[in-house]
Amino acid sequence: MTAPNRNTLWARAIADELAAAGVHAVCVCPGSRSTPLTVAVDAHDDLTVYSHLDERSAAFFALGRGKRTGAPTAVLTTSGTATANLHPAVMEAAQARIPLVVLTADRPPELRGSGANQTVDQEQLYGSAVRYYEDLPEPEVTARKLRSLRTSVCRAVGHTTGPKPGPVHLNVPFRKPLEPVSVPGDVPPSFDDDHPLAAAGRGGDTPFVSVHDGTTEPAGETAAALAAAATTAARPLVVAGPADGGAGITPDAAAALADATGAPIFADPLSGLRFGPHVGDAPVVGGYDGFLAADVPHPEFVLRFGASPTSKPLRKWLAASDARQVVVDPAGGWREAEFTATDVVAADPAATARAIAARADGTRSAWTDAVLDLEARYWAAVDDFQPAATLEGEIAATVAAGAPDPATVFVSNSMPIRDFDRFAAPRGADLAVLGNRGASGIDGVVSSALGAGSATADPVVGLVGDLAYFHDSNGLLALERCGVDATIVLVNNDGGSIFHMLPIEQFDPPFTGQFKTPHGLDFAPTADTYALSFARTDTVGEFRAAYRAALGDAGTHVIEVSTDAEASHRERERLADRVTGLSV
């Protein structure tokens, strides 16, 4: 059907190529200048549209989908300050290597710098954070311009995946009329027949340009040398940090590597390796954040996958070693902020692990057996510990141990992810544990969790702190508007408890007023505002009962656990003192 005007034709071409290139969902925010694109994506049979009222929430929702699927989701806004609200999620996507397509509508070019209403400088708005940027030309009804447009969209989507996934930005200017009204002479009646390729693309689900990603394997001699180094080392180690979007080491490859080299796997909770059916057979270790306080010998050879580990004790322990540390990164990037790594292998992590495993003939070493024994004794010590006050780590442990199999678990930054790292024991359940550890902000956590939940039929569990919940409570609107249910565990310690772990705690003032920032907020009214169930608990026992009940019930449940941040911190220190007595 011939488009009624050039804007409609242009926007339909963009929507067609987004869908054909692999975008399955678009988060749309209301606005006038983006009308042509909103109408086009809403009418497209192969695009699911999620309507959002707040741009920041929409961007994090799209980010969460990308984290869960490894595929790009698009977010669409009008011009002006709406575009700036996407920036935090763009930064997270860039740092965490998560595919994301940003579409910003814009005013005509001559209005830039003119003082025209709702007109700001949107060119290169996100700077170096995006993998690809293009300021698209104004809509024009010529075959070549439309072929160029389709090519640009496909190239942009192609840049969201590959060895270094991440966000891309297409800035799309439109003149009025923005609605799909008929403009005589704008689109010639014969245009579709005269230029079928430009008007309709390649048809079906075939993108105008197919961008093919290749899997880079290490050179044979490199894999052989690494295999020899791993099998001859008395204390080999595999460290798996937070995984990239769709480009991390897989459980089967990690298990094969550990089996062939005899090395244990220190698995970050966000690595994709701490939880899953492979845990029963592979030497997966999760208690290192706690037991490295003991006298643990340093490794001699380390293979590192993923981003820098969440655990500070692990990072410092590795930095203090004289080990050869090999970072395997698909893009050849550097994500090792202690600067003690000795090698970088620019190759696909799973392919590298398999290549090394195929050339290694090691057996499980006495070192690995000792580490696994220490791991077992650490978790026994945690289980036996009787805190004098609510230990927030018990909440994290309960979330991990009690989450359904399968489930998606989204963990907030600050103390929740640190407690999850230290207290969530490896488990054979199929848990997709996610978090925003790229830029490590507390903004957008609720929206990210719900975005991840929108991409799966699995139950969704969120573990958030009070400040993160406050910061993104408007993200709860997605529960009804986007059809997502979740169980949200809200640890309310009335402020920023992480600052108790820093030296500034000793200086009050300004510690309480400027760092801990107690707020005294009552979060129960969010139940009425967002039509959810809210339960307040004061003990770990009460929380466990409420958590079990929520998981067995339909709808969204928020379970608040009231804690004393300082008391919990002291109990964490007391447990650490006990663990210090463990040894290999």
UniProtKB/Swiss-Prot annotation:
Pfam families: TPP_enzyme_C, TPP_enzyme_N. It comes from Halobacterium salinarum (strain ATCC 700922 / JCM 11081 / NRC-1) (Halobacterium halobium). Residues 566-577 have a biased composition (Basic and acidic residues). InterPro entries: DHS-like_NAD/FAD-binding_dom, MenaQ_synth_MenD, THDP-binding, Thiamin_PyroP_enz_TPP-bd_dom, TPP_enzyme_TPP-bd. Binds 1 thiamine pyrophosphate per subunit. It comes from the Archaea. Residues 563-584 are annotated as: Disordered. Signal peptide: none annotated. SUPFAM superfamilies: DHS-like NAD/FAD-binding domain, Thiamin diphosphate-binding fold (THDP-binding). Its cofactor is Mg(2+); Mn(2+); thiamine diphosphate. It is an enzyme of class 2 (transferase). Homodimer. It catalyses: isochorismate + 2-oxoglutarate + H(+) = 5-enolpyruvoyl-6-hydroxy-2-succinyl-cyclohex-3-ene-1-carboxylate + CO2. Keywords: Magnesium, Manganese, Menaquinone biosynthesis, Metal-binding, Thiamine pyrophosphate, Transferase. The gene is menD. One of its GO terms (molecular function) is manganese ion binding. Catalyzes the thiamine diphosphate-dependent decarboxylation of 2-oxoglutarate and the subsequent addition of the resulting succinic semialdehyde-thiamine pyrophosphate anion to isochorismate to yield 2-succinyl-5-enolpyruvyl-6-hydroxy-3-cyclohexene-1-carboxylate (SEPHCHC). PANTHER family: 2-SUCCINYL-5-ENOLPYRUVYL-6-HYDROXY-3-CYCLOHEXENE-1-CARBOXYLATE SYNTHASE, PROTEIN PHYLLO, CHLOROPLASTIC. Its EC number is 2.2.1.9. This is 2-succinyl-5-enolpyruvyl-6-hydroxy-3-cyclohexene-1-carboxylate synthase. One of its GO terms (biological process) is menaquinone biosynthetic process. Belongs to the TPP enzyme family. MenD subfamily. Pathway: Quinol/quinone metabolism; 1,4-dihydroxy-2-naphthoate biosynthesis; 1,4-dihydroxy-2-naphthoate from chorismate: step 2/7; Quinol/quinone metabolism; menaquinone biosynthesis.
